[in-house]
Swiss-Prot record:
Gene that produces this protein: epd
Record's function text: May play a role in neural plasticity. May be involved during axon regeneration.
High-level lineage: Eukaryota, Metazoa, Chordata, Craniata, Vertebrata
Stated name of the protein: Ependymin
Source taxon at top rank: Eukaryota
Subcellular location: Secreted
Secretion signal span: 1-20
Modification after translation: Binds calcium through the terminal sialic acids.
Entry keywords, A to Z: Calcium, Disulfide bond, Glycoprotein, Secreted, Signal
Length: 214
């Protein structure tokens, strides 16, 4: 939390300039971020909740679902977006599934063609520490016949919430306790038992959003 406050102080001048701008370019995530991510369907069904780590420079993402969730299996995925590789990891049985990922956009980073929609306060804009200024971005994903929105902090570009509306599913993302750091850099390294595993075929529109379903 102290680190996030420091980021806001450092970038306060930039934020003030951006506030007055009528046309904003998508901001960039910090080099490293981590926290809790929760995904639900628009019907209110809990789909996933767990800890995420994201390396924006290397474009790598790790998500480990909470084991106390009322589910028979728990998601542990590692995605190397630039390489187009998705690992589904089973650490208990030391097994690994590897798939190609042709569609590489996701909600951990604002796509470069996103449109700035608004800048708003969540909570109070006048009471100290009782409000959060966020920027709302939106855009289309024509390859998936879908559109999305993403809210980030005005200072620091940390994820706050997001939504995905497609032909097959609608998803809502929430991010909590986000910090501009990752405790374990090995989170982005596939386990040794993933070495030598052959790629499994996946459709051309296979994406980050396919991970979350009932």
């Amino acid at each position: 939390m102290h680190t996030v406050k420091l980021l806001c102080v450092v970038f306060s001048c930039l934020c003030a300039v951006a506030w007055a701008s009528s046309h904003r370019q998508p901001c960039h995530s910090p080099p490293l971020t981590s926290g809790t991510m929760k995904v639900v369907s628009t019907g209110g069904h809990d789909l996933a909740s767990g800890e995420f780590s994201y390396d924006s420079k290397a474009s790598k993402f790790r998500f480990v679902e909470d084991t106390h969730a009322n589910k028979t299996s728990h998601m542990d995925v590692l995605i190397h977006f630039e390489e187009g590789t998705l690992y589904e990891i089973d650490s208990k049985n030391e097994s690994c599934k590897k798939e190609t990922l042709q569609f590489r956009k996701h909600l951990m980073e604002i796509p470069p063609d996103a449109t700035h929609e608004s800048e708003i306060y969540m909570g109070s804009p006048t009471v100290i520490e009782q409000g959060l200024r966020v920027r709302v971005w939106h855009g289309k994903l024509p390859e998936l016949h879908a559109h999305y929105s993403l809210s980030t902090t005005s200072c620091g570009c940390l994820p706050v919430s997001g939504s995905f509306y497609g032909k097959k599913k609608d998803l809502l993302f929430s991010f909590f306790g986000v910090e501009p750091e990752v405790d374990d850099p090995q989170a982005f390294v596939p386990p040794a038992y993933c070495e030598g595993v052959s790629f499994e075929e996946a459709p051309d529109d296979h994406s980050f959003f396919d991970l979350f379903h009932d």
